[in-house]
């Protein structure tokens, strides 16, 4: 619930149409996802729904409240295929959609973008993800990456922890924002050398980054500390 509110704090919401999921630690075949229709800004622990990989509601504080079907299709596919990925975040931000619609995709023109150099996947748009038929292609396209650009649709990141998934979506979103602004200026872009791009990506992939992810998550969490009694209920 806190992660939903943090995503809202950073203005990465789209009414009620995006989703975040978290695997239940002692029930690996189940994950928590938002109750469809609740604004991210108002998310509480009690408005999360526990569902299994077949889409069956295992536990819900409010009975007969739906989950987003597209959310189930996308998130269950990733949780099922990648047992190590416990948190999945999907967004529809304006800049994320803009980059997803650009033929060249994400450009290595910022430090944020170079984190993903050769480490971001792409998935072609097939319409609203309401069919489980799309799951196999989604997983094939994701491969072993933690970040994926859904063409003409938005962004998706995943991680072993909430901190990792959040750091991925934050950096991917910032990379897209920088790209849209840079391209809108009309001037010729400067690209760092290939070896610098590779070096930067390796730096972000280093195990030494893990404590930084945790600190970043705690810093983000502190921004909504005053809402604790709400989102924890």
What residues fall within each predicted segment?
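Glycine-rich flexible loops
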Residues: 1-233
């Amino acid at each position: 619930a806190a992660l939903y509110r943090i995503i809202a704090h950073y203005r990465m919401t789209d009414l009620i149409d995006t989703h975040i999921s978290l695997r239940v630690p002692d029930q690996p075949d189940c994950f928590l996802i938002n109750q469809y229709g609740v604004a991210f800004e108002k998310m509480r622990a009690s408005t999360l729904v526990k569902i299994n990989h077949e889409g069956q509601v295992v536990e819900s504080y409010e009975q007969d409240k739906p989950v987003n079907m597209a959310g189930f299709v996308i998130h269950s596919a990733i949780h099922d295929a990648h047992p190590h990925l416990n948190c999945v975040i999907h967004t529809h931000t304006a800049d994320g959609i803009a980059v997803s619609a650009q033929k060249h995709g994400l450009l290595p023109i910022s430090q944020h973008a170079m984190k993903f150099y050769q480490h971001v996947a792409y998935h072609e748009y097939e319409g609203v993800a309401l069919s489980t038929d799309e799951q196999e292609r989604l997983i094939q396209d994701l491969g072993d990456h933690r970040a994926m650009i859904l063409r003409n649709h938005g962004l998706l990141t995943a991680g072993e922890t909430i901190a990792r998934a959040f750091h991925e979506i934050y950096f991917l979103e910032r990379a897209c924002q920088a790209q849209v602004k840079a391209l809108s200026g009309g001037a010729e872009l400067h690209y760092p050398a290939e070896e610098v791009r590779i070096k930067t990506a390796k730096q972000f992939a280093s195990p030494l980054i893990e404590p930084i992810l945790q600190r970043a998550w705690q810093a983000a969490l502190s921004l909504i500390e005053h809402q604790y009694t709400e989102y924890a209920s």
